[in-house]
């Protein structure tokens, strides 16, 4: 390892889907490394064996591969500082925990669950934050050996002082100082022999040469304890980059426990991976310009972690949808058509020109999953209310809509060469003859051929795709519906 090289890591737990916050952490860590031609590592933190979910590891690998966040070292490709799975490094943590015990920076704790529960209840009844009372830190060497020999279950705890202060520097939040009296003697090694996240991440970050640690701001409160571990070992502290939380709104955090969208959920809703990644990059960071559309390569060039905000970032679904539309419009018609085809299945079964439908949708689509509801009227005219014919801006009502359709019907019947251009020319000639505004005729025709308030494209384009026979049939249905409505 090059001592001057920036090394970052993404260290997820295989506990389910890839949450938006986790993906942002991976992206920022990747960008920080690649901006300086550094190394980006993948490490799997599976010390909490009970929370592991089958298939979660595949989700991690697939998400990183799909988004182009490629790691230089990791469990699947190896590297000089492996293993890269924490459960395979158990012996390392035990060794380093023993070093802390020898230094007086950690101790064995034999307290039962009942005693710990009682301590917690006492703290709650007094309205104080729960903190272990150092009961086992006073055990003699003989008592400890006796308990170990008897096979009494134990954990290993960090031995934090009660007096003085500890501070740490964060690249985003600056210098943060805490009273040592507030620091709990956190568990380093659990009773099952596995390390806690809090201990393993410090040991691994040092042994793997991590120079910049990217994580959520919820870990700010644990950082003084991490610093005390670094100091106890005599290790250099990496640069801390704590990112602001991603909020659902001004009151609540985006959370997978509350069922908020994961990366997989967003893909299933029809969002594009590049749009998602671009949007996530802007949740807490901005380039200092009004520019908003960035490829991954653009981000590598522009990303500066010093521009990450302290303030929480709001996950704005409308903004993501807008950005997704921008990405869709960057596709060629052929590329968009390929993406749209699966969404036509089951909705369009008749022999329509699907490429022409894609042409209408291309610049009007923001979300791929909305395609079915935009095109379902092609196969079958939906049941619709005559109220659709009434449009304030177009100045249409039942009576003038009926008149327009009755005048348009013979004009449409007379067209031999059925295409958008001829339909357009014929109807525009009619409008000229009638000396009315375009909307007076076009709105009723569009309503009659689609049965919908919103359509991809106007009356002419829809009529061409439907074909002459189906268009005439639908206009006649519209005439009958309006007559019945007026004569009621």
UniProtKB/Swiss-Prot annotation:
Amino acids binding ATP: 256
Cofactor notes: Binds 1 zinc ion per subunit.
GO function terms (MF aspect): ATP binding; glutamate-tRNA ligase activity; tRNA binding; zinc ion binding
Gene Ontology cellular component terms for the protein in this record: cytosol
Annotated motif 'KMSKS' region, positions: 253-257
Biological processes per GO annotation: glutamyl-tRNA aminoacylation
Pfam families documented for this protein: Anticodon_2, tRNA-synt_1c
UniProt cross-references to InterPro entries, sorted A to Z: aa-tRNA-synth_I_cd-bd (IPR045462), aa-tRNA-synth_I_codon-bd_sub2 (IPR020751), aa-tRNA-synth_I_CS (IPR001412), aa_tRNA-synth_I_cd-bd_sf (IPR008925), Glu-tRNA-ligase_bac/mito (IPR004527), Glu/Gln-tRNA-synth (IPR000924), Glu/Gln-tRNA-synth_Ib_cat-dom (IPR020058), GluQ/Sye (IPR049940)
Subcellular location, record wording: Cytoplasm
Record's keyword terms, sorted: Aminoacyl-tRNA synthetase, ATP-binding, Cytoplasm, Ligase, Metal-binding, Nucleotide-binding, Protein biosynthesis, Zinc
Motif 'HIGH' region positions after renumbering to this chain: 12-22
Cofactors: Zn(2+)
Metal-binding listed as a keyword: yes
The protein's Enzyme Commission number: 6.1.1.17
Chief place where the protein resides: cytoplasm
Recorded catalytic activity of this chain's protein: tRNA(Glu) + L-glutamate + ATP = L-glutamyl-tRNA(Glu) + AMP + diphosphate
Highest rank taxon of the organism: Bacteria
Residues the entry annotates as binding Zn(2+): 109, 111, 136, 138
Top EC class of this enzyme: ligase
NCBIfam families, alphabetized: gltX_bact
Function: Catalyzes the attachment of glutamate to tRNA(Glu) in a two-step reaction: glutamate is first activated by ATP to form Glu-AMP and then transferred to the acceptor end of tRNA(Glu).
Family as reported in the entry's similarity comment: Belongs to the class-I aminoacyl-tRNA synthetase family. Glutamate--tRNA ligase type 1 subfamily.
Oligomer and partners: Monomer.
Protein name as catalogued: Glutamate--tRNA ligase
Source organism per UniProt: Clostridium tetani (strain Massachusetts / E88)
């Amino acid at each position: 390892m090059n001592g001057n090289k920036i090394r970052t890591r993404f260290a997820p737990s295989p506990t389910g889907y890839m949450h938006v916050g986790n993906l942002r952490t991976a992206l920022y860590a990747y960008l920080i490394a690649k901006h300086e031609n550094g190394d980006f590592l993948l490490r799997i933190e599976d010390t909490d064996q009970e929370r592991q979910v089958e298939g979660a590891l595949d989700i991690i690998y697939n998400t990183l591969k799909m988004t182009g966040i490629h790691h230089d070292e990791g469990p699947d490709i190896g590297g000089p500082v492996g293993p890269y799975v924490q459960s395979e490094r158990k012996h390392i943590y035990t060794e380093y925990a023993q070093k802390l015990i020898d230094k007086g920076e950690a101790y064995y704790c034999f307290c039962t669950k009942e005693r710990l529960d009682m301590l917690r209840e006492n703290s709650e009844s007094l309205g104080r934050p729960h903190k272990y009372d150092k009961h086992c830190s006073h055990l003699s060497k003989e008592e400890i050996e006796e308990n170990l020999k008897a096979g009494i279950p134990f954990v290993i705890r960090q031995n934090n002082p009660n007096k003085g202060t500890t501070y740490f520097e964060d690249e985003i939040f600056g210098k943060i100082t805490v009273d040592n009296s507030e620091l709990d003697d956190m568990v380093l090694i659990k009773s099952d022999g596995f390390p806690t996240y809090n201990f393993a991440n410090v040991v691994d970050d040092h042994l793997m040469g991590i120079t910049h640690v990217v994580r959520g701001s919820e870990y700010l409160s644990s950082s003084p304890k991490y610093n005390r571990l670094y100091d106890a070992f005599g290790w250099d502290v990496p640069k801390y980059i704590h990112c602001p939380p991603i909020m659902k709104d001004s009151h609540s955090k985006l959370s997978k426990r509350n069922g908020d969208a994961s990366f997989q959920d967003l893909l299933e809703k029809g969002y594009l991976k590049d749009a998602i990644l671009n949007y996530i990059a802007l949740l807490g960071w901005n380039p200092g310009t009004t520019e908003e559309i960035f490829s991954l390569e653009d981000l590598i060039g522009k990303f500066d972690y010093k521009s990450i905000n302290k303030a929480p970032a709001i996950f704005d679904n409308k903004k993501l949808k807008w950005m997704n539309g921008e990405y869709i419009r960057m596709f060629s018609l052929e590329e968009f058509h390929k993406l749209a085809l699966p969404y036509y299945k089951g909705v369009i079964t008749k022999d329509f020109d699907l490429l022409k439908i894609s042409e209408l949708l291309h610049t009007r689509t923001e979300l791929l999953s909305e395609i079915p509801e935009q095109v379902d009227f092609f196969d079958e005219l939906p049941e619709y209310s005559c109220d659709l014919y009434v449009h304030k801006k177009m100045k249409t009502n039942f009576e003038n809509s009926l008149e327009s359709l009755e005048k348009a019907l013979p004009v449409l019947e007379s067209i031999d060469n059925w295409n958008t251009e001829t339909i357009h020319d014929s109807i525009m000639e009619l409008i000229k003859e009638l000396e009315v505004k375009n909307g007076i005729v076009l709105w009723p025709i569009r309503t009659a051929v689609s049965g919908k308030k919103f359509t991809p494209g106007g009356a002419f384009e829809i009529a061409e795709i439907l074909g002459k026979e189906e268009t005439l049939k639908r206009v006649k249905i519209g005439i009958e519906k309006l007559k019945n409505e007026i004569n009621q």
